[in-house]
C-alpha cells in the first residue's frame, strides 16, 4: 500500500515530466537545400514522436518564422498543430530581415489562433548572433551577426508585437554560445530576456581535451558558466549533440559509437528533466551528407535510429544533479553548456554559409572550424534557419546560423557553446524574472492542466486511503 507522501511524490513527478520539453531542432530546408513543406515537417515530427526505444520527442525548435521568403508563416506551424508537437519559435535576427520575421509571427497568430498558441513554449529572438559578431566568430567566418544593442531592440519589438495576443505571455529568450553569454559586453541581452538558450558542442572544443570521455565534463562546465550569469533566469538546452560521421576535431572522433555515449551521458540525464532540443533528428539524405553529420536516424527518415536511444537507470541516475546544475531559479529547468559548432542560417538544414555557418537542418556545407584562444568554440552546425544545406552567407533566412531552443513547459535549460577569450558573449544579469507557465497561453495552460490533474489524482487517492 502506498502512503500519501509516496502518492504525492509520484503525481508531482508525473506532472513535472509532462511539463518538460524534449525535442529536436528543425531547419526550414531539406538536406539537399530545397524548402520543406508542411508534409515534410509532419513526417519529421511524427518520426520524432515514435522513435524506437524512447517515450517520444514531441517538441520542435525552429530558427525562423518565414516560409522561404517574404513574410508567409513557416509551414512547420500547421504541421505542429496536426502532429500535436510543441514549438520553440525562432525569429532570425541577423541580416536585416526582422520586419518580415515579425510580420510572419503576427500572421501566424491571426491565422492559426489558439490551436497555434497552445503549442508555443517560448520565443527565441535570434540564434548565435552574438557569437557571430564576436572576434572569434569573425575569425571563423561564422557569418553575419549583430550588436547586442540591436538585438535588445529586436527583443523589445517582439514583446510589443505579441502584446494583447494569444502569445502575450510567452517567455522570450535568445540562443547563443556560453562564451557569448559570459561576455560582459553582451550583458544587456541577458537582462532583456526571460530565459537564456544554450548551444553547446564539446566535439568542437578542439583546443581542449575533447575526447568523448571528456565530453560530459566539458558540457557540465559550460553549463555552470552559463548558469552563473543567468542569475534567477532559466537556462534552456537549445542545441547539443555528437556527430555520427565526419572529420575529427582534435581528440573528438565522429562515430555512431561516440554519438551513443554522448546521448547516454549527456542526453539521458537531461531528457524529461530539463527542456532540451537535441541536434538533430536528420541532416543527411541520399548523397547529401554534411561533414560532420549529427543526424541520429542517418540518411533515411525512420523511427529506427542508428543507435539505441533507450536511457537505462544508470544513465538517468544523475538526472537530478544535472537538473540542479543547469537550472536557474526553478528546480525544473537545468542547463548544460559546451562549445558550439560552425555557424548557422535560418534555413536550418545542412548548409553552412560561407562563414562556417550551417543550415538549420544541421549539416555543414562549407566554412571551417577555426580554433581561437585557449578554449575556442566553433559556431553551431545549425547555423542556418533553413535547416538544410544552404550555401551562402548567414545573413538571412536560409543563410545564417540557426539554433533555437524551446520547452514544452515554457521553462527549460540551455547552454551556450564553449569558447573562451575573444568572443563577444553576454553576461546575464538577474534583472528580469522568468515568466511562469501560468503567465502565458499554451504550454502554461498545459502545465497547469498537468499539475491540476496530478492534484486531482492525489486528492482522489488520499480520500481512498
From Swiss-Prot:
Q: Which Pfam families match?
A: Glyco_hydro_17
Q: What is its main location?
A: membrane
Q: What class of enzyme is it?
A: hydrolase
As recorded in UniProt, its EC number(s) are 3.2.1.39
Region annotation (Disordered) ranges: 320-356, 380-440
Instruction: Check the UniProt entry and state the signal peptide residues, or none.
Output: 1-19
Where are the glycosylation sites?
183, 318
Pro-region residues? 443-465
GO-annotated biological processes: cell wall organization; polysaccharide catabolic process
From the Swiss-Prot or TrEMBL record, state where the protein is found: Cell membrane; Secreted, Cell wall; Secreted
How does the record describe the protein's post-translational processing? Answer: The GPI-anchor is attached to the protein in the endoplasmic reticulum and serves to target the protein to the cell surface. There, the glucosamine-inositol phospholipid moiety is cleaved off and the GPI-modified mannoprotein is covalently attached via its lipidless GPI glycan remnant to the 1,6-beta-glucan of the outer cell wall layer.
Which InterPro entries does the record cross-reference, listed alphabetically?
Beta-glucan_modifiers (IPR050732), Glyco_hydro_17 (IPR000490), Glycoside_hydrolase_SF (IPR017853)
Give the induction annotation: Expression is under the control of the nsdD transcription factor required for sexual development. Transcript level is the highest at the beginning of asexual development and decreases thereafter to increase again at the late stage.
Q: Does the keyword Transferase apply?
A: no
> What segments bear the compositional bias annotation Low complexity?
320-333, 380-438
Any Gene Ontology CC annotation? fungal-type cell wall
User: What domain of life does the native source organism fall in?
Assistant: Eukaryota
Q: Does Membrane count among this protein's keywords?
A: yes
Family of the protein in this entry = Belongs to the glycosyl hydrolase 17 family.
What this protein is reported to do is described as: Glucanases play a role in cell expansion during growth, in cell-cell fusion during mating, and in spore release during sporulation. This enzyme may be involved in beta-glucan degradation and also function biosynthetically as a transglycosylase.
Q: What is this protein called?
A: Probable glucan endo-1,3-beta-glucosidase eglC
What lineage does the source organism belong to?
Eukaryota, Fungi, Dikarya, Ascomycota, Pezizomycotina
Amino acid at each position: 500500500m502506498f502512503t500519501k507522501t509516496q502518492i504525492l511524490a509520484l503525481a508531482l513527478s508525473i506532472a513535472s515530466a509532462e511539463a518538460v520539453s524534449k525535442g529536436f531542432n528543425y531547419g526550414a530546408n531539406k538536406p539537399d537545400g530545397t524548402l520543406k513543406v508542411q508534409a515534410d515537417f509532419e513526417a519529421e515530427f511524427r518520426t520524432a514522436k515514435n522513435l524506437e526505444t524512447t517515450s517520444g520527442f514531441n517538441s520542435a525548435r525552429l530558427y525562423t518564422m518565414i516560409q522561404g521568403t517574404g513574410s508567409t508563416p513557416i509551414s512547420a506551424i500547421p504541421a505542429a498543430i496536426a502532429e500535436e508537437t510543441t514549438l520553440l519559435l525562432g525569429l532570425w535576427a541577423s541580416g536585416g530581415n526582422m520586419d518580415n520575421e515579425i510580420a510572419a509571427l503576427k500572421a501566424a497568430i491571426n491565422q492559426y489562433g489558439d490551436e497555434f498558441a497552445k503549442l508555443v513554449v517560448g520565443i527565441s529572438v535570434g540564434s548565435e548572433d552574438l557569437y557571430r559578431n564576436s572576434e572569434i566568430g569573425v575569425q571563423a567566418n561564422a557569418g553575419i551577426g549583430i550588436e547586442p544593442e540591436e538585438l535588445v531592440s529586436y527583443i523589445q519589438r517582439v514583446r510589443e508585437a505579441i502584446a494583447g495576443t494569444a502569445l502575450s505571455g510567452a517567455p522570450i529568450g535568445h540562443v547563443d554560445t556560453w562564451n557569448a553569454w559570459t561576455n560582459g559586453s553582451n550583458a544587456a541581452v541577458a537582462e532583456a530576456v526571460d530565459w537564456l538558450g544554450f548551444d553547446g558542442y564539446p566535439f568542437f572544443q578542439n583546443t581542449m581535451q575533447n575526447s568523448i570521455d571528456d565530453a560530459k565534463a566539458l558540457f557540465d562546465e559550460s553549463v555552470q558558466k552559463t548558469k552563473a550569469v543567468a542569475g534567477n533566469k532559466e537556462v534552456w538546452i537549445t542545441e547539443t549533440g555528437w556527430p555520427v560521421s565526419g572529420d575529427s576535431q582534435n581528440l573528438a572522433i565522429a562515430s555512431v559509437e561516440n554519438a551513443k555515449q554522448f546521448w547516454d551521458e549527456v542526453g539521458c540525464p537531461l531528457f524529461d528533466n530539463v527542456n532540451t532540443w537535441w541536434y538533430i533528428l536528420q541532416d543527411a539524405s541520399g548523397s547529401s551528407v554534411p561533414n560532420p553529420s549529427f543526424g541520429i536516424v542517418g540518411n533515411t527518415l525512420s523511427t529506427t535510429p542508428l543507435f539505441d536511444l533507450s536511457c537505462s537507470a544508470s544513465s538517468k541516475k544523475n538526472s537530478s544533479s544535472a537538473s540542479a546544475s543547469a537550472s536557474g531559479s526553478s528546480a525544473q529547468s537545468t542547463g548544460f553548456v559546451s562549445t558550439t559548432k560552425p555557424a548557422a542560417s535560418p534555413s536550418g538544414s545542412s548548409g553552412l554559409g560561407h562563414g562556417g555557418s550551417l543550415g538549420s537542418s544541421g549539416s555543414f556545407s562549407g566554412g571551417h572550424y577555426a580554433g581561437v584562444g585557449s578554449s575556442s568554440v566553433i559556431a553551431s552546425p545549425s547555423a542556418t534557419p533553413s535547416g538544410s544545406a544552404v550555401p551562402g552567407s548567414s545573413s538571412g533566412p536560409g543563410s545564417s546560423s540557426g539554433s533555437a531552443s524551446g520547452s514544452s513547459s515554457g521553462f527549460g535549460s540551455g547552454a551556450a557553446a564553449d569558447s573562451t577569450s575573444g568572443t563577444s558573449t553576454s553576461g546575464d544579469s538577474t534583472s528580469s524574472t522568468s515568466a511562469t507557465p501560468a503567465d502565458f497561453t499554451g504550454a502554461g495552460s498545459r502545465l497547469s492542466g498537468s499539475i491540476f490533474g496530478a492534484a486531482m489524482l492525489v486528492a482522489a487517492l488520499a480520500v481512498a486511503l
